[in-house]
């Protein structure tokens, strides 16, 4: 019996062993590996086309030196989309509802973009901390504000992904609970609520894909500032 709505976000254990690693490795088993044949099957063709489209959208604003990040960004985006969608299945666990995991993705990648900027073009990277045309009396305050906003970026990335997925899962569970409670007492209202639940589930599927795309898109924008 579930004692709390937030119990669904707790990492599952089996014989004292956390199963979050299994939940993170499972998505890679669902994608077919490319074959050496001249003609691939439809699933591989669609997978390649979608990955290429997403990668093209992400890499178009970047110059040539940033294209080396294409494989990393595309792989991470497909990984996040798959994890988010698998988490919508009944009796499954969504690792991306854990802030620690999302911060583990966000902080190293954000830090890598900052280090690249400081290494390749330190003057421009530091110039982002002070907007052009700032009055002299406001310079110290703006530098502090821009520095704080720079360090908040990875936190915003992780919290945005965690909060959106957590809120969606909670809404689905609340409405599903309401359907089961209303079914014996008011069947008509329960059916109407179930239709709302169906629409909300479709919306959550879209949110699961959009949030993964936004996560990678913001990382690509941070990279664009530093290359």
UniProtKB/Swiss-Prot annotation:
Annotated membrane topology: Multi-pass membrane protein
Subcellular location(s) per record: Mitochondrion inner membrane
CDD domains: ATP-synt_Fo_a_6
Entry annotated with the keyword Flavoprotein: no
Disulfide pattern: none
Transmembrane stretches, start-end: 13-33, 69-89, 98-118, 132-152, 179-199, 202-222
Keyword entries, A-Z: ATP synthesis, CF(0), Hydrogen ion transport, Ion transport, Membrane, Mitochondrion, Mitochondrion inner membrane, Transmembrane, Transmembrane helix, Transport
Subunit structure comment from the entry: Component of the ATP synthase complex composed at least of ATP5F1A/subunit alpha, ATP5F1B/subunit beta, ATP5MC1/subunit c (homooctomer), MT-ATP6/subunit a, MT-ATP8/subunit 8, ATP5ME/subunit e, ATP5MF/subunit f, ATP5MG/subunit g, ATP5MK/subunit k, ATP5MJ/subunit j, ATP5F1C/subunit gamma, ATP5F1D/subunit delta, ATP5F1E/subunit epsilon, ATP5PF/subunit F6, ATP5PB/subunit b, ATP5PD/subunit d, ATP5PO/subunit OSCP.
One of the record's GO cellular component terms: mitochondrial inner membrane
An annotated Gene Ontology molecular function: proton channel activity
Name of the molecule in the record: ATP synthase F(0) complex subunit a
Principal location class: mitochondrion
Keyword Transit peptide: no
Species name: Danio rerio
Catalytic activity: H(+)(in) = H(+)(out)
Upper lineage: Eukaryota, Metazoa, Chordata, Craniata, Vertebrata
Function: Subunit a, of the mitochondrial membrane ATP synthase complex (F(1)F(0) ATP synthase or Complex V) that produces ATP from ADP in the presence of a proton gradient across the membrane which is generated by electron transport complexes of the respiratory chain. ATP synthase complex consist of a soluble F(1) head domain - the catalytic core - and a membrane F(1) domain - the membrane proton channel. These two domains are linked by a central stalk rotating inside the F(1) region and a stationary peripheral stalk.
Any one biological process term the GO annotation gives: proton motive force-driven ATP synthesis
Similarity comment text for this entry: Belongs to the ATPase A chain family.
């Amino acid at each position: 019996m579930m004692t709390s709505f937030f119990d669904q976000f707790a990492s599952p254990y089996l014989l004292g062993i956390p199963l979050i690693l299994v939940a993170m490795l499972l998505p890679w088993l669902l994608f077919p590996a490319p074959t050496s044949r001249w003609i691939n099957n439809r699933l591989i063709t669609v997978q390649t086309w979608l990955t290429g489209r997403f990668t093209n959208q992400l890499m178009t604003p970047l110059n040539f030196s940033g294209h080396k990040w294409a494989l990393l960004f595309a792989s991470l985006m497909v990984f996040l989309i798959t994890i988010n969608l698998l988490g919508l299945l009944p009796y499954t666990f969504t690792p991306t509802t854990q802030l620690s995991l999302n911060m583990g993705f966000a902080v190293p990648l954000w830090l890598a973009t900052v280090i690249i900027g400081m290494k390749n073009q330190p003057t421009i990277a530091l110039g982002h901390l002070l907007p052009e045309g700032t009055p002299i009396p406001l310079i110290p305050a703006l530098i502090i504000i821009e520095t704080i906003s720079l360090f908040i970026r990875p936190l915003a990335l992780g919290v945005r992904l965690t909060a959106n997925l957590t809120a969606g899962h909670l809404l689905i569970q609340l409405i599903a609970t309401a359907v089961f409670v209303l079914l014996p007492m008011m069947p008509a209202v329960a059916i109407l609520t179930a239709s709302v639940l169906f629409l909300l589930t479709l919306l959550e599927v879209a949110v699961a894909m959009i949030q993964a795309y936004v996560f990678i898109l913001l990382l690509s924008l941070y990279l664009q500032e530093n290359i």
